[in-house]
UniProtKB/Swiss-Prot annotation:
Xref: Pfam families: ATG9
Catalytic reaction equation(s): a 1,2-diacyl-sn-glycero-3-phosphocholine(in) = a 1,2-diacyl-sn-glycero-3-phosphocholine(out); a 1,2-diacyl-sn-glycero-3-phospho-L-serine(in) = a 1,2-diacyl-sn-glycero-3-phospho-L-serine(out); a 1,2-diacyl-sn-glycero-3-phosphoethanolamine(in) = a 1,2-diacyl-sn-glycero-3-phosphoethanolamine(out); a 1,2-diacyl-sn-glycero-3-phospho-(1D-myo-inositol-3-phosphate)(in) = a 1,2-diacyl-sn-glycero-3-phospho-(1D-myo-inositol-3-phosphate)(out)
Protein name: Autophagy-related protein 9
Gene it is expressed from: atg9
Subunit structure, interactors included: Homotrimer; forms a homotrimer with a central pore that forms a path between the two membrane leaflets.
Family, per entry: Belongs to the ATG9 family.
Species whose genome carries this gene: Sclerotinia sclerotiorum (strain ATCC 18683 / 1980 / Ss-1) (White mold)
Keywords of this entry: Autophagy, Cytoplasmic vesicle, Endoplasmic reticulum, Golgi apparatus, Lipid transport, Membrane, Phosphoprotein, Transmembrane, Transmembrane helix, Transport
Amino acid sequence: MASNLISRLLPSNTQGRSIYDSLRAHDEASGSDMDVEERAAMAIDEENLRFKDDELGNPADVISGESVTESTAFLSDQQQTPQKQGYNRKGKGKGRSHNLAESPRLLEEDSDDDVPASLLIEGNNRHADPETPNHIRARQTALPKRAPAVPGPSAQQIKEERDRAHWEMTQEQQKLHEDGGNRATGVPHTPQSIPQNTGFYLTGSPKDKAMYRWVNVTNLDNFIGDLYAYFEGAGIWCIVLAKVIDILTLVFVAVFTTFLTQCVDYKKIYRGDARSLEYALVPQCTKKISGMSNVAIWLVCLFVLYRVYQLLTDLPRLMKMRDFFTYLLEIQDSNMQTVSFQDVIARLMALRDANPMTVERISPDNRKFVLGTQSKQRLDAHDIANRLMRKENYLIALFNKEILDLTLPLPFLQGRQLFSKTLQWNLEWCILDFVFNDYGQVRQLVLKDSHRRELSDGLRNRFLFAGLMNVICAPVIVIYVVIVYFFKYFNQYHKNPAALGSRGYTPLAEWKFREFNELHHLFNKRLNMSYPFASRYLNQFPNVKTAHMAKFITFMAGAVVSVLVVATVWDSEVLAGFDITSERPVLFYIGVFGSLWAITNGMIPEENEVFDPEYALRQVIEYTHYMPNHWQDRLHSDEVKREFSTLYQLKLMIFIEEVFSIIITPFLLWFSLPKCADQIIDFFREFTVHVDGVGYVCSFAVFDFKKGDGRAPTQGKAKSDMREDYYSTKHGKMAASYYNFLDNYLLNPKTGVPGHNPPGLRQQFYPPPAFPGLISSPTSGADLQSSRMGRSDVRPMNRAPYVPQQAVRTPRFPSNTTATGSPMASILLDPRHQPPSSELGARSVRRSSRSRYQARRGNNIIEDPMEDENGPGRPVAQPGRSYAVDDTVANLGESTWEVSPAKADADGQDEEEDGDGTGGAGVLGLVYQFQKAQTNGRPGVSIW
């Protein structure tokens, strides 16, 4: 409807049909073939390269072009003609080379992200679907004509047994899933009694219903979005209560505003004719409401009914999600307010590995769509973040690369960027809804150079139409926002005038600070921790002139208030009957001068405050991860302070700018943003990549964990060319996002060390691993064994992280010594997404001493790559000192590495009483051990 309205109001394309018709026709023609990589048939099965075809049961002979099921995987009597690579099933003859020529960014795919087609297992209930004549005809056509089979089933049985043996051997080597008898205790599995679908509702136990819905999920983006919304809302009852309160707030604002504006005769109050409210009320005021007010009231009523309808329709979905959390993830609704999202991901991955089957009844067209972009095999922390932030990652990149023009050519604005929540809503509708289709994927037509001009014109028309709609809706939005803000904050400012000086980050600053694949609750947590340091930084720049004036005004206001208060206490009648000025009693001036004193007193800096702007700003950067290049060596300057002040403003000014932006947003949509249409279309074409099983995502959001942050060394390298600058992020956004992702999902938030492994899995690893970057010493293994890390108390089982026993899962991929062989690896990442083991060991050391290390550095802590353990600027651990262990290892707490758990149980208490221990190894350590052995149990003085 919106597209048709746009095409009618705005000039149409005279050269051909509308771009919306082209997009719609292209989407319908593509259908399930929207997966370019699946049509290309060029996926490499790197996981099975070391196995021969006969070991895998000859998958090339048994896998058809449409589907793979357990029941049809090894029908050896059906020989099929192999299909040529690059051939399009639609008959168009387009291969992979043609598709990649249209979208060069697809060349940057990582073959490690490909999910082998031979590993996708589906339901074995194939006979539930009766074969249609078309299926029988297609199967007969695919089978070559042959002579009748030799009578006797013996040869066929032998061949089936051989194929079954090959398949069982492949399952044993690949560890796709465990059988019911070998499945770990506590891991949920597919119930034996599948609920029956009667057409209107499911019959069976709640757990069976939840499992049936999970198995039949076809749109993982919507499902993961509902799951995250349920997690953020803290359960069904909190979500319902929040929605009800929002509706009641809207109703109260509408009723109270109507009462104040239409049902009260203020003239009677001013003349003194009305001694009480009942005399000032307008009789039958609802019949005297004007036409525009009636229209507004009816619109509000319709909107309230729409919100109530939304709430009622959301209840079944919320109840299904509650069953999913309760019965499959084993998270009760009472624990939703305290459970972490990392624990939810761990349970979801365990559920995925315990039930590696897709939907049972699915058409071939839908199978292409599900396995191409909605594969449940791609469901670790990295893939979930890409699904949840598929659109937000593009907006983060747009703001980082400064593609959007948010300025107006007005002299008094001086090129200032204007951004607000209102403009954000318009950008989401104009850009994201235009680029993404109904399935949440980037339209393939956007990725083609041939339609660049039409797409740019269509985007410009959307900007113009959005500006027109903002002009129509601006008066209503302004009135509603002002009324709600007045009702919400006036009493707070009246009771606490100092709250007028409170600050907050602007919407533009939030998009500049947010990083790729950083979920909303994690970003808010990081941002909230920076508020005290940001306020402290701005207080590091006191204006001496302002401070002197504030002291003088504070002194005068305090003197007047003190005299009036003393006079009132001396004679209470003065407060009621004495007027200082005409119709202004004593109480009025006490309030005025008291508020003035509170405001000016807040401008006076503390006398005992230490001024160090550079140190204070580094503390802010520690959490915001934002440090432009031009801030280098200028953190103490006033220019940096003014620039930071535009990002961290007074909340009152943020509200004023929000109201002002409602008025100027149409001008931005009419004059500034249409100039960026070509760059926006080019951006989506150049920075979109395809990930098998996930779909189209922003290229910056695909972290290459094998290569680290992807930054080349800056020392000894010439200045990067224009192409590298174009295809890279600014201000080190990519590297900051990569390391922040590791901090959130590689490190356990409860313990501060890598790994989310459950206790049962952690205790299985007794030998100490080799951590190349943990201690810069040739004897790091011996140092680790004798340090506190090996002598800490054994973690009690009841203090384990909130991860169920079902998290002990069998890996779906071949064993990887660097990823899964070490307990430092995170269980929230699949083997393909595990960073190198050297980075795992060094990450905890860098994180614990990061702030001190940054304070010593004089350059950007985010832009520069992490130095090597023995690189310049990093202290080298020496044998005679224990700071490397005491600062980074001794405080690991409960999730420390146990070299010998049995011995730690017996001797842990005695060793802790003896002090710091040997301190690692070396001559001094041996001397200390010898001295301790000689004096143990005898009186004497320790020489250590």
